[in-house]
């Protein structure tokens, strides 16, 4: 069953929309360029009825695909027409039923990867890490769908998918850490109001750059009186300044356990590990005790590595001693090209590889090139044919312009460190549940670096940390996805002991080079226009990690205090007078 509906907005906003309604005017196009905007907001949506069987139980649900206007905190000013797809189980009590907002990162990525790859009602079968699945991938009912735990809302950032600014704003006005999080806050608030879900338990689910967005957004929502019940951090990069791929002077200690996991997958570690989890625990300990102080000496004083250390690194990672001797602070680029000579291994999922010079290697990441065309084709067809949304042909899965134009600055740093934002959200809402999910074979957001970042929070009773075999998009792995679903189910239910017994690693004394770090070079191959987007990716000219060590303890508490003093959070400066939103 299909129908067209108009979400109900409260009070003065609803009256403004009705007053400006233009009757039978045609739907606008949704341009995604930097200067693009709509003259007025547009909020028509398609509604379709479906049923999904999960665990033997039939769940009838309604899918809504369309646009909803983010309204500024003044309650009058339209900012952006967000495209979203919501899945709502029928017949549930909205006061008890959770609602979860999903988004990817980039920055400049739509939500297509989470939408059609993870825990929605329908899922593309990729077969990764194998690359033998015929393309385009089949779209199937998803037995790991989260509709048995929560209603689901997939949201595209402004300038991606079909989301676009409303004049006088342009898309570019929302392409920055703070402006992006603020307009997401305003969308969440608009969605909850339009659907009368203000009392529903609120959850956020961000992936990659979506994790720093989640940290900032959670803090802003708490300040706005809409505290989330929980946040999910999939493949985190919470502090860009501590990620060794962002600058030549930033320690790559966070990558070493991932290198070990990748070496084990290819049978290069000596001796071959029996239990991967136990082995990686040993590698973490070795990294903290031996590698980290050595690489700091290498970075600050040029102290050459001890041959015994190089031998141990070769044994636990399979990476040739020559690479470690050449640069002890070994970034993932040389590992991806040098681990298996003549072969390029994936950045998103290092278990995926392709011969150098092959079509699969031509865009710089075979694990991304393999899946991107199918996702790009599937989302348009799915929106049009399954969800009855007629204007999906212009759906943009990623925006290189957004990534190139992005303002990465945040809290006085050129690159964002959002651990203080997450800490501020926890301070405002001590019951906030946080679930961190990482893949062992992800060379974009390494799992041990996530641990080091989260360790700055200290022991947190409501923080769960989980690792799986898999890459950046763990959920594409058919073995790991059911495990991830089980962990998410326990998270939503707040089952006793759901957080587990994760012990934060000890923080190193210093993680970065004293002078400003030299920007890391370009990736081996720059993504082609319309091709796979590196996520997280920072253009080389903007890779200026802070020389200051990450805050923890008293210094972190002081940062949190300053954030809480700014209770309202950042708003988006309005460029000039503009019309009220128009509903047609």
Protein language model annotation of sequence segments:
Residues 147, 157, 174-192:
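Alpha/beta-hydrolase active-site loop
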